[in-house]
Amino acid sequence: MSRAVLAPFEAYQKARVTFVQTVAELAQRPQNIEALQSAGVMALLRPLLLDNVPSIQQSAALALGRLANYSDELAEAVVSNEILPQLVYSLSEQNRFYKKAAAYVLRSVAKHSPHLAKAVVNSGALDALVNCLEEFDPSVKEAAALALSCIAKHNHELAQAVVDAGAVGLLVLCVQEPELTLKRISATALSEIAKHTEELAQAVVDQGAVPYLAALISHPDAQLKRYVCQCLSQIAKHTVDLAEVVVEAEIFPRILNCLKDIDVQVRKNAATCIREIAKQTTELAKLIVHSGGAAATVDYISESKGNARLPGIMTLGYISAFDDSLAMAVIVSKGIAPLKDALMNEPEDHLKAAAAWSLGQIGRHSPEHAKYLAEADVPSRLLAVYMLQESSKDLKDKSKKALKNIIQMCTHVPALEPLLQLAPNNILTYVCAQFAKVLPQNLEAKRTFVQSGGF
C-alpha cells in the first residue's frame, strides 16, 4: 500500500489519540467540565469506546469516568447516551487496562444515587463486574470491587442484586489476597452489603467472611482496620445471632487495642463495633466487661472529643442498662467522670443527650448506684442541662428521665437537698416523693429536716 494512502489514516489515528488523551487530561480539572459538556464531549467520546486502537478505547473510558464522577448530571448524560451497554460488552472482551477504565466509569455513574446505580445494574454490569473479580490482575479486581461497593451502598434492593450476582464469595476471597488496596476495597464492599438488612448480613456471614475480617483487626494498616471494624459492626448490629458470630471469631480482647490506635477513625469504628455487640444481650455485655471492655471504653471516652465519643458513651449506657452488676462494673471502671464531662462540656446536644441517658442507666438500679452519681454531683448537672433554655427537646427529655431514674433510687440526702431549691415543679415531685421515703428511715436526716424547718 502506498505511503500516500497510509498517511491520512495515520494522521487520523494520531488526531484521535491526541483528542482523547487531551480530553481525559482536561476532565481531571473541575473548571474545564462545563466547557467540555457544552462542546458535546459525550457524543464525541462514545464512538471512541469502540475504536480499533486499544489505547484510544481506554482513554475514552477514562475521560467518561472522570466526567461522570464530577456530577450526577454528567452521570445521567452517560446513561442517556447509552454508553453503559457498550462498556459492559467490552468488559468481557477487552484487556485489563480497558476493564479498569470501564469499571471506573460504572463506579462513577453508580456512586451518585440509587437511580443511577439501578441504571448500571439494568445495563447488565453486575455479571461483568463479578467476572472481573476472578481476573488475575489485582488492579482489575480492585476496580470491580469498588464499583460493586458503589452500587450496594444505596439500598437493600441494590445490595441484594450484588449478592444475587454471586459477588460475596469472591469479595471474601479478595479480602484474603496479599494486595493491601484490594483487601481494603473488598472489606468496604462487604460492609456496604451487610449494613442494610439482617438477611444481607447473613449472606456475608454464610460465605465465611467473619473469621478473615476478624484476623485483620491486628493488621498494621490503619485504613484496613477502619474498614474491617466497620464491616464487623455492620454485621453485628442486626441480631443477637450475628453479634455472636462476630464475637466467636475471637475479636476480644484484640479489638480493644484498636481503641488506643493512633488513627481516630480506627478508634471510632472499633468503639462502634463494641457498641453494636454490647446492646444485644446481658451475656454479650458481660463478655465485653470481662475482657476489659468497660475500662477500655472509659479510657476511650476520656481521650476523645466530639462525635468520636458517641459510640463509647452509648456502650457504657447499654452495658449499664442490663443489670446492677454490669452498671457497677462501669462505676468501678470510673465511667461516671467522662460521662459527666460529656454532659457538661460537649457543644452538641445529641452527645449531651447520650451522656444523660447513660448516666440514667447507671443510676436506676439501686441506692448504691445512685449514691455514686450523687457524690459526683450528677443530679444537679442533669438539672442544669434540663433547665437550660437552649437545650433541645430530646436533651431535656433524656435529662428529665435520667434525673427521675437517679432521684427515685437516691437515699443520699445531701444530694437531694439542693434539688428542693432549684428544681421546677415537675422534677420537685420526684424529689419530695423520695424525701417521703427516705426521712422515716434516716433519723439524722429527719432531725435536720425538722430543725431547719424543712431545709
Task: Mark where each language-model region is.
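HEAT/HEAT-like alpha-solenoid repeats
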Residues: S2-E10, A43-L50, P54, P85-S92, ...
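Universal eukaryotic N-terminal targeting presequences
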Residues: M1-S2, L316
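Ankyrin-repeat and related helical/solenoid repeat scaffolds used for protein-protein interactions
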Residues: S333, P338-V385, E417-F455
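Short, hydrophobic/charged alpha-helical patches characteristic of ARM/HEAT alpha-solenoid repeats
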Residues: A7, K14, N32-A39, I56, ...
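N-terminal alpha-helical scaffolding segments that mark the starts
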Residues: A4-V23
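Intrinsic low-complexity tandem-repeat regions in disordered proteins
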Residues: L64, A75, L106, A117, ...
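Alpha-helical solenoid repeat architecture
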Residues: V17-P30, L44-P47, Q58-S71, Y89-S90, ...
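Intrinsic disorder/low-complexity segments
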Residues: V5-P8, L44, E76, A102, ...
